Regions:
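A cross-family kinase active-site recognition segment
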Residues: 113-168, 185-187, 218
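A glycine-centered beta->alpha junction motif in the catalytic cores
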Residues: 102-119, 153-161, 272-285
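Conserved NTP-binding catalytic cores of kinases and kinase-like/nucleotidyltransferase enzymes
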Residues: 1-89, 202-208
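Active-site acidic catalytic loop and adjacent metal/ATP-binding pocket
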Residues: 40-61, 178-223, 235
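All-alpha amphipathic helical-bundle segments outside canonical DNA-binding/catalytic cores
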Residues: 257-271
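A conserved alpha-helical element in kinase catalytic cores
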Residues: 60-103, 113, 117-133
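Protein kinase-like catalytic domain
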Residues: 84, 134-138, 233, 253
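Active-site activation/catalytic loop segments of kinase-like enzymes and analogous catalytic loops
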Residues: 222-255, 273-285
C-alpha cells in the first residue's frame, strides 16, 4: 500500500506511535506517522465508515470502520492465528482488537511488502494458496460466516437509496444474485474479499500471504475467484494469467470448481455479484 498526503490528527498520531512502540517498533515522540492508501484510493477518506490505515516504525495500525462488530472481529483474528490457518495469513502483532482514542476498533500488524502495480502478479502461488486455504478446516466450532453476503447486501441497499438514479434494475439483479448465493453447493474457509491488494510478504523474495481477514469465514469458495473471473469475463484480464491461476488452483485440489471442464457454472453468480459490488463502490466514491 502506498502512502498518501494527509493531515493526521495529533491524537491519532500519538496513539499510532504508542502502539508501534509497544509492538516492536522504534517509535519516539516525533517518529513519522503515515496514512496508507487502500487499493485505488487517491486521497484521504475522513469518513469513519471506512477503515483507516497508519504506518509507523514498521508497524501498521488499522482503525476499523465505526460500528464494526467487536466479537466478530475477535473471532476472525482467532481463526487466522490458530495452527490450521496461520500459515496462510500475515499474522497480527496483537491477537485481539484494541480501541482507538475515538472508540473505534483497532488491529495491529507488521508492515509488509505488497504487490506493486508494475510487478507481475504471482498467479501460480495465488491459485495454490487459495486452494490450500479452501481445503483447510480450522479446529473449533466458533468459525464465523464469511462477510461476502453482508457486503453484497450493503451494495444493494446503497443502490436502492441512491437518489435521482433509475437503478431499480440493478437492485433487482442484486437481490436475485443474493438469493442464489445464500444456498451454496459447497462451503469452505475463504478470505471473503480477495483481490491482489490483499497479498503481502514479510521479505522481498519470500512467499506471499493473505492480508485483511475482515471478511474471512465459512462461505462458497468461488467467492475468492470472483474478482479475477469477472475481470477475465469482461476482457480486463487476459487469458494467460486467468488460465495460470485456474490451473494452479485445480492442481492443488481447490474445491470451488470442477477439476476439469468449464468452471463458469460455479463462478458466474459470484463474479456477477463482485461486479455489482464494484459498481456500487465506484458510485459511492
Amino acid at each position: 500500500m502506498s502512502e498518501i498526503q494527509a493531515v493526521i490528527p495529533r491524537g491519532i498520531a500519538d496513539f499510532v506511535r504508542t502502539v508501534a512502540s509497544d509492538h516492536g517498533g522504534e517509535a519516539a515522540s516525533h517518529t513519522v506517522v503515515s496514512e496508507l492508501a487502500h487499493q485505488g484510493q487517491r486521497r484521504p477518506q475522513p469518513d469513519r465508515a471506512r477503515a483507516r490505515l497508519y504506518a509507523c516504525a514498521g508497524v501498521v495500525v488499522k482503525i476499523h470502520p465505526f460500528g464494526a462488530d467487536t466479537a466478530l472481529l475477535r473471532r476472525r483474528l482467532q481463526v487466522i492465528t490458530q495452527p490450521g490457518a496461520s500459515r496462510f495469513w500475515v499474522q497480527p502483532l496483537h491477537g485481539i482488537p484494541i480501541l482507538a482514542p475515538d472508540g473505534q476498533l483497532t488491529t495491529i500488524w507488521p508492515r509488509v511488502a505488497v504487490l506493486a502495480p508494475d510487478h507481475r502478479p504471482p498467479w501460480t502461488q495465488l491459485g495454490t494458496l487459495l486452494a490450500e486455504l479452501h481445503r483447510t478446516r480450522p479446529a473449533g466450532s466458533s468459525f464465523p460466516q464469511a462477510g461476502v453476503l453482508a457486503r453484497l447486501g450493503r451494495a444493494i441497499d446503497y443502490l436502492r437509496r441512491r437518489p435521482y438514479d433509475d437503478l431499480i434494475w440493478l437492485v433487482e439483479l442484486g437481490e436475485n444474485l443474493a438469493s442464489r448465493l445464500r444456498r451454496p453447493q459447497r462451503t469452505a474457509m475463504i478470505h471473503g474479499d480477495l483481490h491482489l491488494g490483499q497479498l503481502g510478504r514479510p521479505s522481498p523474495a519470500g512467499d506471499w500471504y493473505l492480508l485483511d481477514p475482515d471478511d474471512t469465514g465459512v462461505g462458497d469458495p468461488a467467492w475468492d475467484l470472483a474478482r479475477p473471473a469477472a475481470f477475465w469475463a469482461a476482457g480486463l484480464l487476459p487469458d494467460e494469467p486467468w488460465t495460470i491461476l485456474l490451473n494452479a488452483y485445480r492442481a492443488a485440489g481447490g474445491p470451488a470448481v470442477p477439476p476439469a471442464g468449464d468452471p463458469w457454472t460455479d463462478l458466474d453468480p459470484p463474479a456477477r455479484a463482485a461486479t455489482l459490488i464494484a459498481a456500487a463502490r465506484s458510485l459511492r466514491s
